[in-house]
């Protein structure tokens, strides 16, 4: 790899720096970063001799024999700045035939949320605990793994009265937390870092504000820093939900349209597709007003985007790592598509001497809402 780029590999139940022999055996690395509530995953390909003890260690630990948790952490240092790509666990190990006494080992895994699906505790009661406190209680079990909870209570975060209802957990920890998030229109995911061996467990609304990443530049000759960048405008993807409140005296349903603009999800495009499709959420009539609003906001957030982009870049040309779940600027794509976008997915593809990223972008409409983007 180039001298300005360094790949760090940490393995073990408590992640420690891998020996130089193992790091030199890495031939390819692939890391997938999503958005929303999607899990991150990784795939590491190693070239090891047939009789190497490291080959046996990976097969035993990845298969769950003897080692309860094969933790894998990947970091990248670019121009003196270190970032964690993934902090997860190996879930699958494959062997591929090679030549000259060398075989390939492919280690696949997911972030630490995969560990939350291992053990189920059905029927665990949470008396008088609102959803946010239930999430904190569940995540406390993973503090020893460096999981740092970041939980934002919703407007419907009301503790149930024990004389009326006692919530109980159904299914494993991950599925139950995701269910609680979906009920109020939130997302739940684990993000590696800031330090090796730590991960942030975020349970809250999807955030589309903050300082944008340096602009992706296309069609500007020597200033271009992407290899490809394409855009698509799909007006049928945008939908406006209508929730129903039940009037207490007459029991008549009152329809209320919910916009897709919130303080944490401001418009990134000046001209959205009009008129949007209307979607009636009839199942909200029996909910309380805060719960119905959260359902509407969640639906609106999922169906607010109509402009989509995808492309590929060379990290050394871009000068830093592009990360998902953040904003990024675009310039050189023309008046309808320039401006700020939300990064939905990023796929890191690392090989000896090359570091590529494939990405997808999204926003709510055409034409930028800002006069310029940071470079």
Identify what each model region corresponds to.
Residues 19, 117-126, 174, 178, ...:
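Surface-exposed, non-catalytic interaction/assembly patches
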Residues 14, 47-49, 77-79, 89-96, ...:
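Solvent-exposed coil/turn segments that connect beta secondary-structure elements
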Residues 28, 41, 84-89, 106, ...:
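Well-ordered beta-strand positions in beta-sheet-rich domains
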């Amino acid at each position: 790899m180039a001298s300005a780029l360094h790949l760090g590999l940490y393995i073990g139940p408590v992640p420690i720096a891998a020996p130089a022999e193992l790091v030199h055996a890495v031939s390819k690395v692939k890391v997938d970063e999503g958005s929303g509530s999607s899990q991150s995953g990784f795939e590491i390909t190693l070239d090891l001799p047939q009789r190497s003890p490291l080959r046996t260690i990976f097969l035993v630990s990845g298969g769950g024999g003897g080692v309860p948790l094969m933790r894998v952490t990947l970091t990248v240092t670019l121009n003196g700045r270190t970032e964690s790509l993934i902090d997860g666990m190996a879930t699958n190990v494959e062997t591929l035939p090679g030549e000259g006494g060398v075989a390939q080992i492919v280690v696949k895994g997911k972030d630490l949320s995969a560990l939350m699906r291992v053990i189920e505790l059905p029927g665990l009661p949470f008396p008088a605990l609102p959803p946010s406190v239930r999430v904190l209680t569940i995540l406390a079990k993973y503090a020893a793994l460096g999981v740092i909870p970041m939980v934002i209570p919703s407007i419907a975060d009301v503790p149930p009265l024990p004389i009326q209802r006692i919530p109980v957990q159904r299914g494993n920890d991950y599925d139950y937390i995701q269910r609680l998030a979906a009920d109020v229109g939130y997302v739940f995911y684990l993000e590696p870092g800031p330090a090796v061996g730590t991960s942030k467990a975020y349970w809250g609304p999807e955030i589309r504000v903050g300082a944008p990443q340096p602009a992706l530049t296309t069609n500007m000759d020597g200033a271009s820093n992407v290899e490809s960048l394409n855009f698509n405008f799909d007006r049928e993807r945008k939908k406006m939900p209508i929730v129903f409140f039940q009037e207490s005296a007459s029991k008549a349903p009152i329809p209320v349209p919910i916009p897709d603009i919130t303080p944490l999800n401001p418009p990134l495009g000046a001209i959205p597709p009009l008129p949007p499709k209307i979607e009636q959420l009839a199942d909200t009539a029996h909910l309380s007003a805060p719960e119905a609003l959260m359902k509407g906001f969640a639906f609106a957030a999922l169906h607010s985007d109509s402009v989509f982009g995808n492309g590929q870049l060379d990290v050394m040309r871009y000068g830093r790592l592009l990360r998902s779940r953040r904003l990024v600027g675009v310039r050189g794509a023309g008046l309808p598509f320039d401006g700020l976008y939300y990064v939905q997915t990023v796929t890191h593809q690392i090989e000896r001497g090359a570091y590529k990223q494939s990405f997808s972008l999204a926003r709510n409409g055409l034409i930028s809402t800002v006069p310029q983007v940071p470079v």
